[in-house]
Amino acid sequence: AQGGDVFFFYGISYKNNAGRLLHREQPQILFERLKEGNAAYCAGWATHYALDSCVHPFVLAYEGAHRGAFLHQKYEKDLGLYVSRRAGVRRMILPREKVLACTFAVCDSIKKVLPYVTAAGTASCLKRHYAYTRRQLKTKKQEFELDCDYSQTYKAYQNGVTLGVRAVQCVLEKDIDEEVFSKG
């Protein structure tokens, strides 16, 4: 459920990067548009939105208190490992073919927000994001990169799951509740 993150790989310009533009949208307005696209993609994005809304304050606080490259990505990767270990579940990634099979559904949804996005550009983003994710999960034996206590962030993660359930219900009912989609 990567939502707009795959579009960080769309476009060369930092200022006009599709991923950045999508993340700057007001959540309620964004989901009002997305709900008219592919329901599964929109629901997945709703879970991503919910988790980001609840967890990002911890990620940003860590970034603000520490120096280093890619702290945001490292923190989120470590949190994913922490959650998977707490749940006793191995992290997995969909096969490449299944990811790429979503190209047109994803593109059709994003065009509701950014009309200039093309199917070819979407496919390119999905390929790059898939490769990035594979690199992140490249080894079976995964270790934490940061020396951090994720227990408080885990509580925020649990709140994000609860919010995610509500957000998905809103999306599937095509009723974008202002209370749910005002956390961004």
Regions found by a protein language model. Give the residues of each.
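N-terminal leader/auxiliary helical segments
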Residues: 1-184
